[in-house]
Amino acid sequence: MKTGKPDRPYYQQTVDETLSNIHSTLEGLSGTEASARLQQHGENALPQKKGKPAWLRFLAHFNDVLIYVLLVAALLKLFMGHWVDMFVILGVAIINALIGHIQESNAEKSLQSIRNMLSSEAVVVRQGNHETIPTTALVPGDIVVIRAGDRIPADLRVIEAHNLRVEEAILTGESTVVEKNSDALSGELPLGDRYNLLYSGTTVSSGGGKGVVVATGGETELGHINQMMSDIEKHRTPLMVQMDKLGKTIFITILVMMVALFFFSLLFRDMPVSELVLSLISLAVAAVPEGLPAIISIILSLGVQAMARRKAIIRKLPTVETLGAMTVICSDKTGTLTMNEMTVKAVITADTTYRVEGDSYEPVGNIHPVDDPTPVSVTQGSLLERYLRTIDLCNDSQLIKDEQGLWKITGGPTEGALKVLAAKIPLPPLDTEMRSKIPFDSQYKYMSTLYRLGDEEVILITGAPDVLFRLCQYQQTNDGLQPFDQPYWEGKIEEYAREGLRMVAAAWKPAHEGQRELDHPDLHDGVILLGIAGMMDPPRPEAITAIADCLQAGIRVKMITGDHPQTAMSIGQMLGIGNAASAITGRELEAMDDRQLSDAAQQYDIFARTSPEDKFRLVQALQSKQEVVGMTGDGVNDAPALKRADVGIAMGIKGTEVTKEAADMVLTDDNFATIASAVHEGRRVYDNLKKTILFVIPSNIAQALLIIIALLAGNLIPLTPVLILWMNMATSATLSFGLAFEAGEKDIMNRPPRKANLHVMDGYAIWRVVFVGLMIAISAFVLEAWLQPRGYSAEFIRTVLLQTLVTAQWFYMLNCRVNDGFSLSKGLLANKGIWIVSGVLLALQLLIIYAPFMQMLFGTGALPFRYWVITFLIGFVMFLIVEAEKVLTRRWRKTEA
């Protein structure tokens, strides 16, 4: 029998309608029918996309135009028998590919994490008998038996429930367990409100029941997420795009120069072809910044380590750079912007309204009347004493202190908040005994206990105010009982709801003498309201500061929550979120087309009653407006939005493994302040990357110009390919790390985010690298022209030129460390990295100039001390010229920023 799509959602159908539409019965399917449906629907498993093998992923790192230049150069060296040069050039290409391969993040892990969430076996009813079968054999129409601790094997419609509670946090992000029942529901409901459906991958926390399979494999909610994860293409970061463009520009420039010089030298200089090819190989190797990809990867890796120390784990290297360009952060509320510790802030009785101090589970903080800061004390028999004892005893949670000295609760957050409140004031000692209990249930929304309190026997009740208001006939005062005044209580609830407080009521009544059992009819008369507590999940103090820092840095913060709009706006105002005076709901977003959604995404900063699906659309809407978006999440349903965002941010504590795998960054403390800290670090790393690029490229320009001038003049080629590679890989790479350790500029969080389309090689950067490259090349050329007529050997001249270029690079590194201001500032001494790399560079230069085996390998010769002095003075003069250039071009640089 075929099972197609229902005409209306299964959660809107009764049990009988569901069974009828899916062609099943309470006795289950027959074996024959189950086999036929397995053929029709396929196995209950998520579709898998075949990933690329490791060797193909490694080879992909050679797919770069600059690497092509090196590979061709190595090949030509091989044909010409220059084995050492060939191995050195090829080694550089392989090292670059290895670094890229090691740093690469395997996106397939996120899909594998989803597949790992599926259970392996299920108990089903087939032809009236219970059978244990592999979950892969489940088909629509199977009746599945559900027990506490089970992982739901497919999407089910509940047909029988016994105190069935399910943990759906992996799917919805909401930490509270969900009470499930078999009743039909009406209207369009978000996933988290479909109380008669069970979803594949979620876990039964208590109770049991049965459900009929309504979707398997790729048709389940988990399957839809799996498909979305497969289909989403991650945006390339601005730096990755720019470096590709830079590489292609360098490649085209090299190609044009080589062709022009080949014909010029062949026609006008009558050079032998073999010598000309060697010269052009030197030119190609000189013009390619071979070390730059590796340098960028390593600088990003250092940024990753710095962020890890600040509790932000970066999973994908380019994220470090993207953080600096982020313009919008969409953040969950609970636990990220707030403490995730529900705390009572107000207690309202018929006599008095109290303020409650304290913002965590630690049982400290005074309770005092709103108009009097004097802390209250509790006396035996007072209204406050009875109220506090009621919320303490009619409560399934416990307040405990762990081994680290931190206070925690067991049980639900609402009960936990009441338990903490009761612990803030010592109650008079009293002998108590619980005799019976009605557990809390979402159907009737209250909990009740039967207690002996000393010589008194009482029934205690806590629950939703609207429910207890219907039960109460009286209200308690310190002077006795009064008739229940509902308008008074409703007015108080409305008043405190505007502050974002969630209300819970407490009541009591005398029990019958000798009563041992408690049932719902016992609560139908004589119930006395004691008071209501207003509670909230308070904002993290550090989140308030972090949001202010983000706003100062030009980054808008948007809060996404499942709360009521009024509550969300209240929390938003406490946090200092920009436009917290208005909110929009998920239902309103669902009704919008793409254009309307794009406008709303920019207009509003508070998004209430939202689902994880809304997050995905919000990311797309903001990106359509050219925003660089950071998005937080913890549930499996958040994973597509995190993968789509420019920076996906997962929670390390409450986040699922799937979400962490999909994310670019994981917060180990689930704290919004960590995001702001990561943005600061991202901006610092980008600044240092730009400084590094400005530092590396002039050296390549200078080397290329020296070779071009030599070819045009018909002179000796001043630098061999291996010497060029030494400068590009050993010298430039070593010195670049000094810039990687530079501290952030003072105004780093006072600037707006950089424009994503602003090229790292902007107008000023092009001027700077050409200016410095020309200056280094001219100084080296003049020195070479001075040395050649004096009869020095080719090895000696090359060694002097090598030392000149290296010394010029060292001084230019000092120029690059400060964008605006004198480079020899006090911060120079604070950056130990610069002095470490300077020491390493000195050791390397001594090695290549004086070690016999290095002289043989690289064709160098020993230098007298005076040439160290000469090259040092040349470098120092260039340093002063660049410092003067920074002053003269300051206005231009500010225009480019």
Show the residue positions of the predicted features.
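Conserved cytosolic headpiece of P-type ATPases
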Residues: 1-750, 758-761, 774, 785, ...
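Generic alpha-helical transmembrane segments
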Residues: 730-731, 776-777, 799-813
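Membrane-water interface at loop-to-transmembrane-helix junctions
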Residues: 755-774, 794-800
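A C-terminal functional module that forms or caps the active site or interfaces directly
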Residues: 816
